[in-house]
Amino acid sequence: MKSSFARKISAGENELVPAVVSVGYLAKKPRRIESFFRSGGGTDRRLPWEQLFFEGRFGASLAEESAGEYAKSLEMVRLAPSASNRQPWRILKEGNRWHFYLQRTPGYRERRLVKLFTVADLQRIDMGIALSHFELMVRDLDLDGYWEVGEPDIEIPNEDTEYTISWVT
């Protein structure tokens, strides 16, 4: 049985809509329901820089000054939205490469509500949003670079940490 949303967008019988993106401008004065969802979803609380960005190895926080011209792009990643506000991305700078890792939340996929409502890997979608925020800001700042897939020889902190892709400058 299709949801009313699926019917509204004319999703086919075998089509799956794992995520929806809203586009537009913020209202000058948010409605009560918007304020409720913003506060309840934790959108105003982001992990601090030192928990997301590393240099050389995991555990060695990247100083904002060491990020150089990429500091603003990393800040856009830090501010990117994510399901349940988990921010499941970690970025490790190694020379001229920025390695992006998915830091899985232990037990996240096993939670009852996530199992009930999830039809896609939301943390992987979150990673895509973070990658987009990074590249859009890099392009806006007119910085050079390209994406490359090739797992680096870096010790990961645990089995919940998965390499995704690298940005090469």
Label the model's feature ranges.
Residues 1-169:
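Acidic, surface-exposed loops and disordered segments
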